[in-house]
C-alpha cells in the first residue's frame, strides 16, 4: 500500500471527498510541530546566523540567554571542588550535584561502565565558552564532558537571578583562568 497518498485516493467516489476532510486535520499536528522548530535549527538550515529572539511576554527574559550545562565527574569530591570554583568565579549561579549516576560509553575501543556524579550548572549562555575552558583546565578526565542546552522558558525571577549573579563576569569580557 502506498502510504504517501491520502486514504481517500485509494477508495474513490464520495469516500474520497469525505476522507480528504478527515485527512487534513491529521496533518495539522505535524505541520504545527514543524512551525515550532527552534529558530537556530531553521537558520542553520538556511545558512544565516540565528537572530536574537524577542523577550518572553512580560518577563523580560530572552529565551536561550540562560543555559544548563552538564559535566560528569569521577566522584563527589571532584564535583564539589569544581562546583564551588565555578560559583566563586561567577561562571555559574548555581550547581546541582546528582550523585551515583551510571555512565556507559565507549573509550579507546572498549565499552566502559562507571559510577559518576553529574553536575547541572546554570549560567548565562554567553559564559558557556569560559565555563568550558575552566572545567577543562581543572577536570581530571582526559576528555571532560561539558555540554550545554539553552533554557527557553522557566521561572522569570529565577532566570533573572542567574543573570544577576553572573553579570559581572559576562560584562567584563575577559576569559577566566
Curated annotation (Swiss-Prot):
Q: Which GO terms describe its cellular component?
A: membrane; mitochondrion
What is the top-level taxon of the source organism?
Eukaryota
Decide whether keyword Signal is in the record. yes
Chain ranges passing through the membrane: none
Species name for this entry? Mus musculus
Which SUPFAM superfamilies has this protein been placed in? Answer: GlnB-like
Q: Which PANTHER family match?
A: DIVALENT CATION TOLERANCE CUTA-RELATED, PROTEIN CUTA
Locate the coiled-coil region(s) and give their ranges. Answer: none
Signal peptide range = 1-32
What's the name of the protein? Protein CutA
One annotated GO molecular function: enzyme binding
Q: Which family does it belong to?
A: Belongs to the CutA family.
- Keyword Signal among record annotations: yes
Which keywords accompany this UniProt record? Signal
Q: How does it assemble?
A: Homotrimer.
Q: Which GO terms describe its biological process?
A: protein localization; response to metal ion
Q: Which InterPro entries match?
A: Ion_tolerance_CutA, N-reg_PII-like_a/b, N-reg_PII/ATP_PRibTrfase_C
